[in-house]
Amino acid sequence: FYFNTGGPGYVLSHATLRKFLSVADDAEHCSSEETTSAEDVMMAKCLRQHGITVTDTRDKLGRERFHMFMPGMQYNWDLTQKNWYTRYNADWGLKNKADCCAPDTVSFHYAKQPAMIRHLHALLYHCDPSDSLSETANHINSNFSNISS
């Protein structure tokens, strides 16, 4: 069973959202009475029962765009761990380090603190390899001097 994790957020087409809203009360396939805190799994099961399947959101190299964890944890993931996340990704394999994240990443789960968001913004939009290091560093430091992890 494949589903897109809901932690980092959802991206649904207008048609899919309309369909979900029209079938969400289907107690047999979309029951919110099932005992689970995993609403993303419930949503995927509900949509699947109504003919809507999820799309693989990884890039052509298999790097994720929607991440289950914060950037540091995603990057440093120990591929030898035996847990639910490793088992869930067994069919297509986990990636870490430079291969963990697609360049057009959409979101990270747990990145909720304002300082973390500013830090990510600075890394994504103000670190230009064509700039000199000092220009980039000065820009980031002057605009985001209160960043903490």
Task: Locate the predicted segments by residue.
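Secretory-pathway lumenal glyco-enzymes, predominantly type II signal-anchor Golgi glycosyltransferases
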Residues: 1-149
